[in-house]
Amino acid sequence: VLNTVSGLLHPKHGSVVFEGKDLKGVPAHKIVERGMAQVPEGRHVFLQMTVEDNLEMGAYTQPNSTIDAGIADVYERFPRLKERRKQIAGTLSGGEQQMLAMGRALMSKPKLLMLDEPSMGLAPILVEQIFDIIRELHTAGTTILLVEQNAQAALSVADRAYVLETGRITLSGTGKELMASDAVRKAYLGG
């Protein structure tokens, strides 16, 4: 779903509309320029580049005069990245790479941030930190589109939630409504 929204895949049916404009045929880099950024499953940071170089790569749509301020904002949100700014990204822990992937996406100043399985492979304490950051971003006005297997964590931050099965929406509601749903509790929350 996220690869279709971000222009990496083309929909066979339907359309993707963002801010009233159909994105059919719009190249992925132009979608980023329109205010959308994706943090892919598995992070996909530039492993041979430093933390700071990775962040600069995320700012390619921004004027050069704003890049330093953008990096400072990311370091404020992710202090661990500031400590590691000259370190090669491939040597970071999984949690640090997830922070870097999120920070790189934030460098483009997105209106819509798409996160694909941000908790995948992370220790529980890091999952909690990542979801705290997701809450902070949402509170600050960034719209978040989250795809996440950890239903409890995802529903705890969701204004709206959808359960997809084989590409079709089978349930929808607020995060609280789905958390209270017997079907969701039985299928996804172990109850």
Regions found by a protein language model. Name each.
Residues 1-191:
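Glycine-rich phosphate-binding loops of nucleotide-dependent enzymes
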